[in-house]
Amino acid sequence: MVRKHRISQNFLRSPRIALMLIGHSNIRKRDFTLDIGAGSGVFTYALSKKSAQVLAIEFDRETFKKLQNNTKKLENVEVLCVDFLRFNLSKLPKNYKVCANIPFHLSSPIIQKLTVAQNSPKSIYLILQKQFTRKLIVSDKNFTSALGVKTFPFFESKIKKPLQKSDFTPPPAVETVFFEMKRRETPLISKEEQPIFNDFIEKMFAVPEFYKKNCQPKFKTKKPSELKGEEWLEIWRFWQNSDKIE
């Protein structure tokens, strides 16, 4: 397979590595899987062997032609040349799963899109920068990002496997991991509350005075990035029952 290097995207060297990673997922032969930023199709090919149906999305037209050529004999694979951030996820079957090696610079918007969608995936598996994933895991043991807090009520996140630089071409300059986000069977807040919750979290991280005015005194000595998930839920419920100070 011919591969083209693009900014902040490092491609897996072979389908063998992709198959090994899929082995660390909960993807099964009955599943519909989505490959985002499919490149020339290394992950797509591996997914075609491990799931019932694969939709591979690639935005770069030159790379898409290679993807088409490399997957034309795979009967359970459909390929689309579209911008994933504009793609309508409601077109996909319920409980689809995502497994992809995405461009690192698009990690946040891609995760945001997947996790706020009405038809969100049952499981998400992404190759990501290790430092970025640490901020997605809500814990008082590491600094958490606003995105990590926003996804916490709806998805359980963890690092599944560290990767070697030699797994990629070109080798990345940063440490990378295979990251899992599993949709909670019962979300910790309702899906209907998600837009308001997300706006609230964004403001709590961005505006220090808003944070200090809208959380309990016991949390004011901590930064937003230092709180545990359970503490954020407590703050959220406190704010819902308060006068909502701006």
Please tell me what each predicted stretch does.
Residues 1-2, 213-222:
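Short helix/strand-capping connector loops at secondary-structure junctions
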Residues 199-215:
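Flavin-binding catalytic cores
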Residues 1-199, 203, 230-246:
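Catalytic cores of RNA-modifying enzymes
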Residues 221-231:
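Catalytic core of IPPT-family isopentenyl/dimethylallyl transferases
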